[in-house]
From Swiss-Prot:
UniProt cross-references to HAMAP family, sorted A to Z: SecB
Lineage: Bacteria, Pseudomonadati, Pseudomonadota, Alphaproteobacteria, Rickettsiales
Superkingdom per UniProt: Bacteria
Gene Ontology CC entries for this record: cytoplasm
Family statement drawn from the similarity comment of this UniProt entry: Belongs to the SecB family.
Alphabetized InterPro entries for the sequence: SecB, SecB-like_sf
Record note on quaternary structure: Homotetramer, a dimer of dimers. One homotetramer interacts with 1 SecA dimer.
Gene that this polypeptide is encoded by: secB
Protein name: Protein-export protein SecB
Function: One of the proteins required for the normal export of preproteins out of the cell cytoplasm. It is a molecular chaperone that binds to a subset of precursor proteins, maintaining them in a translocation-competent state. It also specifically binds to its receptor SecA.
Keyword Transferase included in the entry's annotation: no
One of the GO BP terms on file: protein tetramerization
One term of GO molecular function: unfolded protein binding
Amino acid sequence: MPQQKMRIHGQYVKDLSFENPNSPFLSSSKAPDINVMVNINSAKLEGTKNKEEVNEEKSFHEITLHIEVKATVKDEGIKDGVAFICETKYCGIFSIENLKELSEEEVRQALFIGGPTFLFPFAREIIARVTSSGGFPPLMLDPIDFETMYEQQGQQQKSNGSNSNFN
């Protein structure tokens, strides 16, 4: 297997939202229930060449790590129970070199395992800071095993048809 070279050329917050709808009326002393949803998207950037074109051996991709966190509490005074909702789309611009030598599966693994693994600590820090600024303890998300997530999504997509996004 050829060694793939994946480089990051930039990273940034594409979207960030924090909702604290029941403040200052939230009085629950219990820890909220935390629901985390993760979605990964990869988009080939315009102006980069396809794998089949021989004069180009690398391609550029924007990888988006979309994380949505919803914290709920059981509090009679709060009708919907929402403590907060935090959502971020954290992106990186990556290039993959040696493209002609890589299989399609190796490229997908770089995009949906390597890219998100690099981006996650930065997105995690942003979520911790935003929840802290919202008046809650900093939310430190547990590490995510993107390889296992990739494998699980691959199994689901084989039965449902293919897609370039992973949830």
